[in-house]
Amino acid sequence: RVVTLFFTLVFASIIIFVSLEIIPGDPASYMLGINAQEDTVIALKKELGLDKPKFERYLIWVKGMLIGDFGVSYTYRSPVIEMVGERLWVSLPLAIYALLLSTIIALPVGIFAAANRGKILDFSIMGFTQIGIAIPNFWFAMLLVYLFAIILRWFSAGGFAGWEDGIILGLKSLTLPAIALALPQASILARVMRSSLIDILSEDFMKTARAKGLSFKKALIRHGIR
């Protein structure tokens, strides 16, 4: 498996490098603009290592990936690793926040749907979860901004406030994006939770617990959810 993984990574790196190479355009000319002098473009190519043979550039690129040197962004002209580090302090808390929200929403919804299997409430919940899966994140995010930031003014529509002003304000800035990301995940998790609980409720030990006089609610909480 290790050998297979190694060759898979090598093959993937070759495909990525070749794909970047065949894209039309010259990075040096793009960075300097269309009015750049030829000698300036040549100097920048040398600085970026674009004047070297493709195989040598591939080896340099792979070595940089292994040691965490991702080069310089052609658009922002800054080291990529620094840009990733700056954005990681926002993206990682946002991902964790969205994961927590999706779990908090999905568990009770899935349990409630399983407890009311075959009833109107169950069909309604499953219908809403299907809508949650189908709604695009960006459209739902715009709807949240319009409702809670523009109309109700509960949140700011100005983007991330930063962690410098406190964790509470930072989390408040991430709330709407986290909800937009959490909705489809919560919908999927709720459906999975419902299906799993329905399977568990049909097991023999659950039937035995009910036959011994344990109420459905207690059987669900003590044995089903566990």
Task: List the predicted regions and their residue ranges.
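Internal alpha-helical transmembrane segments of multipass membrane proteins
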Residues: 6, 10-11, 15, 19, ...
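Hydrophobic alpha-helical transmembrane segments of membrane transport/permease proteins
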Residues: 8-59, 152-173
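Short amphipathic alpha-helical coupling elements at transmembrane boundaries
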Residues: 33, 43-46, 60, 64, ...
